[in-house]
Amino acid sequence: MRIIFLLIALICAGLVSYALYLQLADGLLPCPLCIFQRMAYWLVGITALFAFIHHPQRLGRRIYCGLIILFSLAGAIVAGRQAWLVRFPEAFECGISPEEAFLNELPLARWWPDMFEANGDCTDGTWQFLSLTIPDWSLLIFLAFSLIAGLLWRSRSISSSNLK
């Protein structure tokens, strides 16, 4: 069970690293919704890493899984919104969004602008893999994290089943 938390943390680190690669090497600028998703990946990954290090019993595991579900569903909502905007760009208002102004004023954006500064277009769907855009993949991954955390939340640990 512990290894699953480590895998989630490593997947999150890989996804955030790949997002930085797309930004810095390919010039794909992140929009405000992309930054919110990055933050959600950070929160899911750090929570999973803490769960791996802590190796909690049932109550602690449920707390960690609950946080992963919460952060993953928040990320899924944002990714779903962006996936919708990519398909229906006419629904997006031009100009600087309140989210962009808010994000760019956060201390994180000043401390690490490459990671947390938003200056891209939320309707940009140019990058695709297997006919799915980045927000589509992000939505699927966040939902998968929620499902996995839900299954871990419900599961019994091997040690507790041996005690009965």
From Swiss-Prot:
Positions on the Periplasmic side per record topology: 22-39, 81-136
Pfam families hit by this protein: DsbB
Topology of the protein relative to the lipid bilayer: Multi-pass membrane protein
InterPro entries: DiS_bond_form_DsbB/BdbC, Disulphide_bond_form_DsbB, DsbB, DsbB-like_sf
UniProtKB keywords: Cell inner membrane, Cell membrane, Chaperone, Disulfide bond, Electron transport, Membrane, Oxidoreductase, Redox-active center, Transmembrane, Transmembrane helix, Transport
Alphabetized SUPFAM superfamilies for the sequence: DsbB-like
SS bond list: 31-34, 94-122
Localization in the cell: Cell inner membrane
Residue spans crossing the bilayer: 5-21, 40-56, 63-80, 137-155
Listed GO CC annotations: plasma membrane
Record topology, Cytoplasmic segments: 1-4, 57-62, 156-164
GO molecular function, one term: electron transfer activity
Main location per the UniProt record: membrane
GO BP term (any one): protein folding
Family: Belongs to the DsbB family.
Record's function text: Required for disulfide bond formation in some periplasmic proteins. Acts by oxidizing the DsbA protein.
Name recorded for this polypeptide: Disulfide bond formation protein B
Organism in which the protein naturally occurs: Nitrosomonas europaea (strain ATCC 19718 / CIP 103999 / KCTC 2705 / NBRC 14298)
Gene: dsbB
